[in-house]
């Protein structure tokens, strides 16, 4: 059997625990399809028992994917296991992920259980899960702070009861490569099983070592890595799958193993997650950041021009970044636009290209040239707005006096209902956001506001990122438009729409 490092993607489960991130039902389906295109082996679609909305999205993903294994998370509770079974039973490859905490601090303060009670719970619930699933994965939560002898007992119990995947979570990002690698070596040497056991690594990045720890696990026998796209996740995030995959590819001379990811889909996957999560990828991010293949130093530039391998250990094309960014202009027609969409990997029916072409022409009238990044922004922005609960319809601004501005904001929902209100503020942005708050009637507080440009130049499209709390809940929003104020309004409305979507999801609506 061909050996490869399996990728277990938990963007839709652990990744969504990032503060402010709330994927809509439609976004979750689109992300799942893209992850299947990228080639992940297993997709953890969610925690079905947590809410009616989560159950429905896991169920929909299970019914949609045609090649990828779909996994649901369950505590050591029979009701959780039942929920995962019902949500994933129609998946082409259903998998259950059962977990329980094993560290002293968790046993004492969270579970209030003894070690013996934990072992009995593992026995009861892994055995129960095995009645419904051919593939059962078990995780001892906070494994890296668990006594080694007790960890061995927990894993052995899970294996004896039918678990064939053993995942070792560094839940709080506490471990370091040598230590984490030794845990795998110890388990592999001490666990007895008549079946083949796959060992999996799940690392958090609190100390900045998630990818390094995952690679150490591979060096010590792990065959599966859990992670998220762009490394999103609670606190400092999770193992960034794209970084792990490219490390294995570039240094296959050392690791001797690779993933089966379609690496040319890496940048596209990263962009989609960035867009839907409302979190911009840092410019200096490894693999997918804007500066990943940029060279400022004259010496470096000279070397790259003579031979790219002087300062580039991989090509931009490898991860799906096109070097042939031939811009379109205001004289470009529908055929040229359609060919550009095709070259960028978009499969859009001709009848659905009309609105996109209209947006392209509007931008082309304002810019000297429309680049690939502009096109990506148009596509992703349009898809996102089409799926949004609310969209900005019109925005009017007027100077009042003494630095005060008035704003009239009109938005519409999916059903075409119109909502309008106005307000004043010390500047355009404050006035706009006050008006939006009046429309939604929620208590909100702006935490962060940033403007980035989609492309270079004074004629670039603006990309506005906002982070705010609505009724105490953190949410993010992104707005893209050639007009900075309109983009700002879009971002703020999107944040409110995400909050509304989260409320609907908890109530089981989508």
Swiss-Prot record:
Residues 5-267 form the Pyruvate carboxyltransferase domain. The keyword Manganese applies. GO terms for cellular component: cytoplasm. It is an enzyme of class 2 (transferase). Its EC number is 2.3.3.13. PROSITE patterns: PYR_CT (PS50991). One of its GO terms (biological process) is L-leucine biosynthetic process. It catalyses: 3-methyl-2-oxobutanoate + acetyl-CoA + H2O = (2S)-2-isopropylmalate + CoA + H(+). Residues 391-510 are annotated as: Regulatory domain. SUPFAM superfamilies: 2-isopropylmalate synthase LeuA, allosteric (dimerisation) domain, Aldolase. SMART domains: LeuA_dimer. Pathway: Amino-acid biosynthesis; L-leucine biosynthesis; L-leucine from 3-methyl-2-oxobutanoate: step 1/4. One of its GO terms (molecular function) is 2-isopropylmalate synthase activity. Belongs to the alpha-IPM synthase/homocitrate synthase family. LeuA type 1 subfamily. NCBIfam families: leuA_bact (TIGR00973), PRK00915.1-3 (NF002086), PRK00915.1-5 (NF002088). Catalyzes the condensation of the acetyl group of acetyl-CoA with 3-methyl-2-oxobutanoate (2-ketoisovalerate) to form 3-carboxy-3-hydroxy-4-methylpentanoate (2-isopropylmalate). This is 2-isopropylmalate synthase. The lineage of its organism: Bacteria, Bacillati, Bacillota, Bacilli, Bacillales.
């Amino acid at each position: 059997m061909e050996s490869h490092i399996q990728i277990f993607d938990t963007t839709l489960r652990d990744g969504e625990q990032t503060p402010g991130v709330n994927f809509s039902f439609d976004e979750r389906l689109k992300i799942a399809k893209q992850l299947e295109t990228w080639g992940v082996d297993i997709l953890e679609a969610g925690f079905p028992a947590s809410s009616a909305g989560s159950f429905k999205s896991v169920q929909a993903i299970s019914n949609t994917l045609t090649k990828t294994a779909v996994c649901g998370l369950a505590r050591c509770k029979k009701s959780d296991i039942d929920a995962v079974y019902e949500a994933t039973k129609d998946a082409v490859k259903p998998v259950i992920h059962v977990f329980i905490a094993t560290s002293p601090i968790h046993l004492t303060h969270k579970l209030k259980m003894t070690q013996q009670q934990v072992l009995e719970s593992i026995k009861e619930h892994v055995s129960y899960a095995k009645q419904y699933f051919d593939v059962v994965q078990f995780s001892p939560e906070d494994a890296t702070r668990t006594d080694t002898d007790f960890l061995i007992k927990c894993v052995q119990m899970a294996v004896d009861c039918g678990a064939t995947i053993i995942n070792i979570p560094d839940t709080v990002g506490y471990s370091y490569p040598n230590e984490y690698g030794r845990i795998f070596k110890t388990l592999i040497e001490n666990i007895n099983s008549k079946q083949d056991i796959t060992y999996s690594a799940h690392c958090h990045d609190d100390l900045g070592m998630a990818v390094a720890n995952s690679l150490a696990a591979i060096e010590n026998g792990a065959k599966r890595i859990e992670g998220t796209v762009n490394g999103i996740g609670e606190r400092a995030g999770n193992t960034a799958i794209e970084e792990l995959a490219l490390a294995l590819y570039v240094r296959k001379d050392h690791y001797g193993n690779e993933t089966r990811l379609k690496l040319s889909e890496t940048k596209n996957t990263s962009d989609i997650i960035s867009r839907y999560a409302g979190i911009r990828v840092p410019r200096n991010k490894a693999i997918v950041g804007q500066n990943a293949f940029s060279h400022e130093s004259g010496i470096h530039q000279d070397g790259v021009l003579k031979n790219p391998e002087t300062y580039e250990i991989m090509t931009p094309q490898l991860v799906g970044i096109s070097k042939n960014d031939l811009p379109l202009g205001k004289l470009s027609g529908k055929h040229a636009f359609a060919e550009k969409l095709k070259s960028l990997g978009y499969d859009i029916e001709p009848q659905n290209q009309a609105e996109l072409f209209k947006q392209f022409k509007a931008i082309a009238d304002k810019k000297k040239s429309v680049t690939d990044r502009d096109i990506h922004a148009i596509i992703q922005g349009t898809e996102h707005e089409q799926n949004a609960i609310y969209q900005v319809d019109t925005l009017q601004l007027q100077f009042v006096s003494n630095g005060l501005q008035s704003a009239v904001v009109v938005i519409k929902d999916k059903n075409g209902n119109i909502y309008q209100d106005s307000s004043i503020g010390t500047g355009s942005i404050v006035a706009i956001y006050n008006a939006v708050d009046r429309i939604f009637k929620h208590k909100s507080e702006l935490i962060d506001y940033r403007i980035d440009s989609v492309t270079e130049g004074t004629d670039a499209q603006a990309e506005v990122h906002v982070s705010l709390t609505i009724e105490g809940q953190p949410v993010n929003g992104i707005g893209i438009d050639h007009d900075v104020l309109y983009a700002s309004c879009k971002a703020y409305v999107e944040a409110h729409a995400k909050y509304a979507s989260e409320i609907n999801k908890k109530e089981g609506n989508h």
